[in-house]
């Protein structure tokens, strides 16, 4: 049965893996994972409903550069699924962003020596709350409150499809299902690609990944939420 949405989404962190020194713990130390409960806080304090879950990861660019770690090494040791294999779609051998990629819709893209690269791995909205454009709300809240210093943002459509964790696989395949109904994952991704393109995020080749600047996404998501 469809729930009545009260109109006030909130993200509650379920714990964070803190950054630690890569000199002691390897390249993977420059990544941080964030897990969130998505709640509807529009009702009374005694009536806060769970709406869904979200999972994000963050690459500390300042720590990466300070320790002489290349973006390629950082991608290869990413805790997220399938990031490393798409490196060549975005970067040259010198670590510069490909001009062919920039032509797909990202005009000005670069890695600063501070800030971060954020990856939106999973946003799962319970089917009872479908139809309220909550994915856009969740992403906007995350960028405004948890990713203010970010330079780049990844969006992944089906990030856990190769994971051995069957529960996560089942959850991941439900991403955006209620907003982008289709008969196959590929069709879902194509529809999602059209949606992301409208808000400033081009698809990376034929992969299930999308890429753009945080600022372009903020502008685009505002536009999408107005329509």
Task: Give the ranges of each region predicted by the language model.
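Non-catalytic substrate-recognition and accessory regions of acyl/acetyltransferase enzymes
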Residues: 1-130, 141-227
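A short glycine-leucine-enriched loop at secondary-structure breakpoints
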Residues: 132-134
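Hydrophobic positions on the alpha1 helix immediately C-terminal to the Walker A/P-loop
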Residues: 138
